[in-house]
Amino acid sequence: MAEALGAQELYEKMFEQRFTANDKEYQEYLKREQDQPPIVEDWKMGNQRNTDRYRDNRHHRGWDGRQNWSSNSYNQSYGRGGWGNSYNQYRQDRHNYQQGHYTHNPSNQRFHSDRY
């Protein structure tokens, strides 16, 4: 403990004039011209359209402006997904995938892969 106090006192003595008017190196640093910030050109990958993930892309929704494809009356009345609806198929495939490759461990509530 005494060595730690001695080291602390040593460093305080070494750096007591740091960043003051008596610190010649720091004063030279303050006198130098500031660096210009870097200029980054084409940071949005040039002229590629529809790459903004925050854009909602309304022009891809369909000819009649339906916003929720999985709950329209066409798909519900015929009971077979209809045109343009693969949501239930995706969920079924995903469910089978999770059952095939992952097991649930109730002791720590995490999924463990049997692939490794």
Curated annotation (Swiss-Prot):
It is found in: Nucleus. Residues 56-116 are annotated as: RNA-binding. InterPro entries: RAMAC. Residues 67-78 have a biased composition (Low complexity). Its main location: nucleus. A motif (RNMT-activating domain) lies at residues 36-42. Residues 97-110 have a biased composition (Polar residues). Residues 1-55 are annotated as: Interaction with RNMT. GO terms for biological process: 7-methylguanosine mRNA capping; RNA 5'-cap (guanine-N7)-methylation. Keywords: mRNA capping, mRNA processing, Nucleus, RNA-binding. The keyword Glycoprotein does not apply. Disulfide bonds: none annotated. It comes from the Eukaryota. Residues 31-116 are annotated as: Disordered. GO terms for cellular component: mRNA cap methyltransferase RNMT:RAMAC complex; mRNA capping enzyme complex; nucleus. One of its GO terms (molecular function) is RNA binding. Belongs to the RAM family. Regulatory subunit of the mRNA-capping methyltransferase RNMT:RAMAC complex that methylates the N7 position of the added guanosine to the 5'-cap structure of mRNAs. Promotes the recruitment of the methyl donor, S-adenosyl-L-methionine, to RNMT. Regulates RNMT expression by a post-transcriptional stabilizing mechanism. Binds RNA. This is RNA guanine-N7 methyltransferase activating subunit. It comes from Xenopus tropicalis (Western clawed frog). The lineage of its organism: Eukaryota, Metazoa, Chordata, Craniata, Vertebrata. The gene is ramac.
